[in-house]
Amino acid sequence: MSHRYEIKLAAQMAEASYSGRSNASLAAAWRDGLDQHDVQAIFLKGDILLIPGSNSVMDYLKFNLRVLNIGGTRYRLSDEHTEKGASGTVWHQGFLHHAKVIYDWLERQRYKPKFIIGHSLGAAATQILVRTYGVPGIAFAAPRPRRSRGAIKHSELCLCVNRDDDMVCDLPGTFHHMGRVHRARAARSVFGPDHSMKHYRKVIDEQQTGGHLHRHWPS
């Protein structure tokens, strides 16, 4: 039976992930954390995996030109290099290597997540790790990590919640999301960092109040 999680609570946790253990709610639930180059992840009691990304992305250009330093290798997110994951799925190479650092850490620590929550770069990793572990996940402000489109195994377990005014969610342009994508139209567009979790929490409230978004995932 799949673990079920409140979408609003998941958004709160995603925002809190940028504060780490200084956030009281995370500190109480904290089991372990990873902070290695450009890769961060938090493993919480209840076997919840939390993956922050970029809460301060201001625009399309800054995100598209971002360079990740992973294991001494540099990956530019605007590159279209791909690589097959262990499942045989073809992913964006930079996103895949980011997710693999988290996977290797989980394996070393013998942690197995029951639910995965990620934002931004962490939302790309969420999609990949949902495919790996076969557990539900919510990806906020999700870029596109997958080369091809269409359903694959476990894709029904992944929910991508994207604001329709967040250009990061359309990157890289020739790639695709995994799972169900909920494009949320905000009552009012934000000038500046509409990519941040603060603005995602607001649009989730609006969408749920209007009956456009379920309260839980899986719904």
Regions found by a protein language model. Name each.
Residues 8, 46, 155-156:
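Sequence-level motif detector for i,i+2 pairs with an aromatic at +2
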Residues 117-122, 126:
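Gly/Ala-rich beta-loop-alpha elbow adjacent to hydrolase catalytic centers
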Residues 20-117, 143, 150-152:
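A conserved cap/lid and substrate-binding interface adjacent to the catalytic center
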Residues 2-6, 88, 95, 193:
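Intrinsic-disorder-associated interaction segments
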Residues 1-32:
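N-terminal low-complexity, Ser/Thr- and acidic-residue-enriched intrinsically disordered segments
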Residues 104, 108-113, 131-219:
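Serine hydrolase/lipase
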